[in-house]
């Protein structure tokens, strides 16, 4: 008897928690980007939602959720700068590939009218990819990086 199953894909997004009290408009921006990003995941897989991670504790919680669900793959959306402590606890105990999605929302900045929250929320592809890749390498994790400009969400 053939049983149809779907691959289980853990999905989460990260941002530096220290930015949020300084720039509260980033919260709805990041929530909207993350919701749009999740919609790009095909319904041919079972999405396990780890949420938006801004602290080590939230990363650990996402990792617990991924382990409990026995995910086959993890996809991480980098919303803005974040350190690897936002990522590593979520994937450290998993033996699955990790895909870092590092895209900025807008292709061309309007420099004359760009403020810090706009830069951090819509124009900044994460500069911490190197740190995260190095940590994934040290942890022996299979990984890939997708980087560039989002076509659309």
Where is each model-derived feature located?
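Metallocofactor- and cofactor-centric catalytic cores in central/energy metabolism, strongly enriched
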Residues: 1-153
């Amino acid at each position: 008897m053939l049983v149809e199953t779907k691959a289980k894909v853990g999905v989460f997004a990260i941002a530096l928690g220290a930015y949020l009290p300084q720039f509260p408009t980033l919260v709805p921006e990041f929530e909207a980007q993350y919701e749009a990003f999740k919609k790009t995941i095909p319904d041919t897989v079972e999405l396990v939602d780890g949420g938006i991670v801004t602290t080590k504790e939230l990363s650990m919680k996402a990792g617990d959720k991924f382990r409990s669900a026995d995910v086959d793959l993890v996809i991480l959306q980098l919303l803005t700068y974040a350190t690897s402590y936002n990522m590593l606890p979520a994937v450290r105990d998993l033996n699955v590939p990790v895909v870092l999605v590092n895209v900025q929302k807008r292709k061309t900045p309007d420099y004359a009218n760009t403020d810090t929250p706009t830069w951090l929320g819509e124009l900044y592809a994460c500069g911490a990819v190197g740190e995260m890749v190095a940590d994934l390498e040290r942890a022996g994790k299979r990984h890939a990086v997708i980087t560039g400009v989002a076509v659309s969400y």
